[in-house]
Amino acid sequence: GLVSNLGI
């Protein structure tokens, strides 16, 4: 997901 892509 988007959060994973940000590394968060």
From Swiss-Prot:
Lineage: superkingdom: Eukaryota
Compartment annotation: Secreted
Key words of the record: Secreted
GO cellular component terms listed in the entry, alphabetical order: extracellular region
Tissues expressing the protein: Expressed by the skin glands.
Name this protein carries in UniProt: Dynastin-4
